[in-house]
């Protein structure tokens, strides 16, 4: 099984692969509106249990994102317990992504 976390550098490389992993942003809608990574799908952590099985493909790679990495790691572990084997949390969240990969993404 994959490591529970993926580094920003490793995810940046994966984005260009086919099929690219789904980027799942589990932050609140106001956070997503403040700063987001292009192509991300926003399902807030609090809505995950009611939406995951209808909206996420358990066979498709998923990278989960939040602000600093705590919520995304929690959602990653929950999804794995639900049978999603190809899911990883973006280490450091969007904060680290903005610092290390794309400084045009606002920090908050």
Regions found by a protein language model. Name each.
Residues 1-22, 28-61, 70-108:
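Rhodanese-like catalytic fold shared by cysteine-dependent sulfurtransferases
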Residues 65:
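Short, surface-exposed ligand- or partner-binding patches at beta-edge/loop junctions that are enriched
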